[in-house]
UniProtKB/Swiss-Prot annotation:
Biological-process GO terms, alphabetical: blood circulation; cell surface receptor signaling pathway via JAK-STAT; cell surface receptor signaling pathway via STAT; cellular response to insulin stimulus; cellular response to interferon-beta; cellular response to type II interferon; defense response; defense response to virus
Primary role: Signal transducer and transcription activator that mediates cellular responses to interferons (IFNs), cytokine KITLG/SCF and other cytokines and other growth factors. Following type I IFN (IFN-alpha and IFN-beta) binding to cell surface receptors, signaling via protein kinases leads to activation of Jak kinases (TYK2 and JAK1) and to tyrosine phosphorylation of STAT1 and STAT2. The phosphorylated STATs dimerize and associate with ISGF3G/IRF-9 to form a complex termed ISGF3 transcription factor, that enters the nucleus.
UniProt protein name: Signal transducer and activator of transcription 1-alpha/beta
Species of provenance: Homo sapiens
Mutagenesis / variant outcome for changing residue 165 to G: In IMD31C; gain of function mutation associated with increased STAT1 phosphorylation due to impaired nuclear dephosphorylation
Modified residues (Phosphoserine): 708, 727, 745
Variant or mutagenesis effect after changing residue 285 to R: In IMD31C; gain of function; increases transactivation activity in response to IFNG
Gene: STAT1
Family: Belongs to the transcription factor STAT family.
Gene3D superfamilies, per database record: EF-hand, SH2 domain, signal transducer and activator of transcription 1, STAT transcription factor, all-alpha domain, STAT transcription factor, DNA-binding domain, STAT transcription factor, N-terminal domain
Modified residues (N-acetylserine): 2
Amino acid sequence: MSQWYELQQLDSKFLEQVHQLYDDSFPMEIRQYLAQWLEKQDWEHAANDVSFATIRFHDLLSQLDDQYSRFSLENNFLLQHNIRKSKRNLQDNFQEDPIQMSMIIYSCLKEERKILENAQRFNQAQSGNIQSTVMLDKQKELDSKVRNVKDKVMCIEHEIKSLEDLQDEYDFKCKTLQNREHETNGVAKSDQKQEQLLLKKMYLMLDNKRKEVVHKIIELLNVTELTQNALINDELVEWKRRQQSACIGGPPNACLDQLQNWFTIVAESLQQVRQQLKKLEELEQKYTYEHDPITKNKQVLWDRTFSLFQQLIQSSFVVERQPCMPTHPQRPLVLKTGVQFTVKLRLLVKLQELNYNLKVKVLFDKDVNERNTVKGFRKFNILGTHTKVMNMEESTNGSLAAEFRHLQLKEQKNAGTRTNEGPLIVTEELHSLSFETQLCQPGLVIDLETTSLPVVVISNVSQLPSGWASILWYNMLVAEPRNLSFFLTPPCARWAQLSEVLSWQFSSVTKRGLNVDQLNMLGEKLLGPNASPDGLIPWTRFCKENINDKNFPFWLWIESILELIKKHLLPLWNDGCIMGFISKERERALLKDQQPGTFLLRFSESSREGAITFTWVERSQNGGEPDFHAVEPYTKKELSAVTFPDIIRNYKVMAAENIPENPLKYLYPNIDKDHAFGKYYSRPKEAPEPMELDGPKGTGYIKTELISVSEVHPSRLQTTDNLLPMSPEEFDEVSRIVGSVEFDSMMNTV
């Protein structure tokens, strides 16, 4: 998509800024007609080089002539007139000063980019504000619902107290009247009738009050159910989905404390309702009557309250931290046999009476059908302490939790020789950890169970990359925790999904994810030149099939580069010095108009173990197309001996017997090499202690340094005029430094 096309999609307030960039000296018509051609030229270079500016000026006039011809074929007289007028104006204004035209065009394109960036930031801010506002409004709404439940419980508490007072008064008056009727003198009939009418009235008030209390409890349970459904079916589900994303490198998951607060308030409210129902039963036992609303509704109210509390407490039992080996904290859900792993459980209902009352047991592959239905499906035993009591003391935030820190898996070995004829390879075989406990209170027994996300069990660390690929693919595409047959028929992933997850793999271990250009290159590798966000990528294409003409799959190549960055290139990657994922064609397109000695850093596409190289541009001696030179890629072996910044600093090329020189001058687009990498150069080491080598005049070891030297034919260099012939002594010294490796076969020398 051209920059000019993107600008035309902006809101009117940004389009107005674009209009202000252009006037008669360089009209907008030319920008419109020659949009793509203008954007492909290096106007910054032209603005600083009169000869280059002159060439671009005449090229632009030629482009206008071509456009005029197209309008002629279309018989568009008005546009022909405009083109001729624009061309004459350009010739009048810039024929003698082409640099001025280049400066204007460069400035306009630069300002356009700023307008696009400002518009993008504005849209992101608007989107972020809208999203934040929506989330905040949703949180406020839930807060209001939870408070409403709590307030209604308190209201019912007061209503039951009023009911109890009314019933006590009614009972007292009934007994008083009965006692007076049994007295010797009796009660006057008129007085007796009056008191009976009063009791009748009180009875009706009592009946209405009981009906009112029962109705309010029913209403409370209705509101509680709606609130609880929002917590369980919306908030908790969203948290679990965010946890899946966080497990595979996505944004960190939100804290559970707010969710715990809501769950706890609702649970406390339901516990209070249970106490209120007990109170109503006590009142019923003291006094009941035909069609008593308490007698009629109490069982339904008990059952419904228990059902809501059971659903809430069972849903609140979650895996707060998924199974993970401490040795690989950024690769959760991949477990190696014989290596300890940790997992943390949490109860979102934080009631003091539950502290130290819930004993959690961990089980492996409980009720997993695949154990019997999938041929070759492995079975494992759990070693270590597999029971733990939940408490509030071990957690830093005081939550009710249980953390298993010393669990291990051991494979059950079947008698006979194990075959690998099953439909799933080891790293596609999904397993699960289940956790059980039981809540016991007077008149209340509830079984709790939760399950981890699927895990991959490996027996060798070399299986870790493939195992992690399975975890990525599953959690990117599935929200179900128990779909362990997923890889029998794994679905395809859309490039829009996979590209985001690939970027997470870099941003989760570095300070920088993948930008659009880098992702476009990877998309073309997987989908070809017509890659689109909706392009479908099969699982086998991502992880199992050799990519293009290479002898390794796409994911293992990415994983190797990740390891190379983490161990050897992290500061350079974080600073944005490494372009990394760029095709050779795109690389040459970027470098061809740059000044000699401009270079960029990219990852090798042909190295299975991950490698990085640099390519620089030189002007050809015959004035034709520029020459490009790429050094043999550096792997972890070379980078373990010498840091990459030092390699760039000391790199030399040698032609025949001339003095070696460093061809690397500017990091693309125009950053001085020492400015880009200087802070990473190794500092000089202290001189070694003198040693007696040849008597009293011995001065110790002679310091050596590892450098990279490439021999090239003189014709491949920009020029050899400035490479002075070396004396025999100088040549011998260089040969000594380089070593005995033959120059014609040498690329990197130790």
